[in-house]
From Swiss-Prot:
This is Nucleoside diphosphate kinase. Homotrimer. It comes from Neurospora crassa (strain ATCC 24698 / 74-OR23-1A / CBS 708.71 / DSM 1257 / FGSC 987). The lineage of its organism: Eukaryota, Fungi, Dikarya, Ascomycota, Pezizomycotina. Keywords: ATP-binding, Kinase, Magnesium, Metal-binding, Nucleotide metabolism, Nucleotide-binding, Phosphoprotein, Transferase. Major role in the synthesis of nucleoside triphosphates other than ATP. The ATP gamma phosphate is transferred to the NDP beta phosphate via a ping-pong mechanism, using a phosphorylated active-site intermediate. The gene is ndk-1. ATP binds at K12, F60, R88, T94, R105, N115. Transmembrane segments: none annotated. Belongs to the NDK family.
Amino acid sequence: MSNQEQTFIAVKPDGVQRGLVGNIISRFENRGFKLVAMKLTQPGQAHLEKHYEDLNTKPFFAGLIKYMNSGPICAMVWEGKDAVKTGRTILGATNPLASAPGTIRGDFALDMGRNVCHGSDSVENAKKEIALWFKPEELNQWNHHSAAWIFE
């Protein structure tokens, strides 16, 4: 299978509190992606500041960190063909009001500050985010037997 890659997807505290984790997992599984790592975690302020370090000069940074630190986060690594690009498509636009119906944000979110989930925006950032949130031994390598029925 060409363009096999991994992406980091996180269900943010609002998504966890609203009971959307299972639905979000289903969206990725139904599309044909393979879940290789998952944990429910409250990583703390320092970890979140590192994750969002590219936004640290933005006026909303402190509020973002406070919100992300307000409850558990479901951190996941998904693997498959064009996982980063397709994962972002499944999530929808960062601003839920600009997200198409049928996307996670288009179906479950209304406010940019409570947009339910995070997804890596590039292959390079996916690698960095996966390394920040997971140890190498937490990434499971297993055979996705339905892959033959999903990919040529």
